[in-house]
Amino acid sequence: MDEADRRLLRRCRLRLVEELQVDQLWDALLSRELFRPHMIEDIQRAGSGSRRDQARQLIIDLETRGSQALPLFISCLEDTGQDMLASFLRTNRQAAKLSKPTLENLTPVVLRPEIRKPEVLRPETPRPVDIGSGGFGDVGALESLRGNADLAYILSMEPCGHCLIINNVNFCRESGLRTRTGSNIDCEKLRRRFSSLHFMVEVKGDLTAKKMVLALLELAQQDHGALDCCVVVILSHGCQASHLQFPGAVYGTDGCPVSVEKIVNIFNGTSCPSLGGKPKLFFIQACGGEQKDHGFEVASTSPEDESPGSNPEPDATPFQEGLRTFDQLDAISSLPTPSDIFVSYSTFPGFVSWRDPKSGSWYVETLDDIFEQWAHSEDLQSLLLRVANAVSVKGIYKQMPGCFNFLRKKLFFKTS
């Protein structure tokens, strides 16, 4: 598949994953020899086996099926009555071709004799590179920014860093916390995603609060001198907690909380000197409280406004005053002015975070989709803005991801 078709598929992936009816496609894909039977079986087993996971894997694998893969896929859509998607892809493909001039369409310009003679060249006034938008049409400008150590973190090592995923699913009965069905789907998606971004991924499941802290300390005490970055992902129930800088807390399987502030503080310059000056990224999929956001009315025809196929569950637990002393004492002890830290929350403080038992959490599912499509060309903050926009329009109840950004530079993931 050529690069233009590949870019088109990535731009359209969110809509395809939302609308593609994969069950109708298998025979058509086989008859047009786009895929072989064992490939179809692999796609059907992708993720949780849900329609969305199958659709996502199909689009990813389609990129590897040759130069005619996209037009053949469009024909398969037409064969199975999915005319709107077929027309959408065909129109966008034609528009992309028309917007790119070819040599045969260019008219030669004949220079007048008087201007063929070289003139004295005048120095051009330097023009600043626009780095504010996050997206870059000029590949050269993007690569120049990636390689500028004054403007962007340089992730050049292989692997570029450690990634620890703590996935708490089953909680003790005394905690009163429900099993987080669907979290294993989130965990697997993130394991694959950060592996593809050149991280060494380690997964630890069902940890008590004490074991969570020990796992984090163990990671912080490793030598990160030859690495460029560090990622911590926590999938658990959560609650509000008093704080100085980073709100919220996450629960161990014993029902005891660990404040996000404590987690971040484990990786500060004093506790983890080998990560000094390097980006430390934290992704928290847990509730920030117990409020359910009904949103407010806006005029919209977006398909994402419809609620998911199954009832989502919150990762919510009410605010506990008993956490106040715990968090306050910990925060006062030695938390320095934060730098090179980025904390991404699945929801706005005080509100619940929704998780679908069959397809995983809204936040992780969207994060995975956005990283797949845009991580090669956009920086971390731009990616998370896309995630926030996509998650905010889902479901009957609303959810608004957010972040605390103490990075000093732009961060582009290593994708090749």
Swiss-Prot record:
Protein name: Caspase-9
Pfam families, sorted: CARD, Peptidase_C14
CDD domains, alphabetized: CARD_CASP9, CASc
Self-association and partners: Heterotetramer that consists of two anti-parallel arranged heterodimers, each one formed by a 35 kDa (p35) and a 10 kDa (p10) subunit. Caspase-9 and APAF1 bind to each other via their respective NH2-terminal CED-3 homologous domains in the presence of cytochrome C and ATP. Interacts (inactive form) with EFHD2. Interacts with HAX1. Interacts with BIRC2/c-IAP1, XIAP/BIRC4, BIRC5/survivin, BIRC6/bruce and BIRC7/livin. Interacts with ABL1 (via SH3 domain); the interaction is direct and increases in the response of cells to genotoxic stress and ABL1/c-Abl activation. Interacts with BCL2L10.
GO molecular function, one term: protein kinase binding
Modulation of this protein's activity: Inhibited by the effector protein NleF that is produced by pathogenic E.coli; this inhibits apoptosis. Inhibited by BIRC6; following inhibition of BIRC6-caspase binding by DIABLO/SMAC, BIRC6 is subjected to caspase cleavage, leading to an increase in active caspases.
Source species: Homo sapiens
Residues found modified as Phosphotyrosine: Y153
(Microbial infection) ADP-riboxanated arginine: residues bearing it: R355
Tissue: Ubiquitous, with highest expression in the heart, moderate expression in liver, skeletal muscle, and pancreas. Low levels in all other tissues. Within the heart, specifically expressed in myocytes.
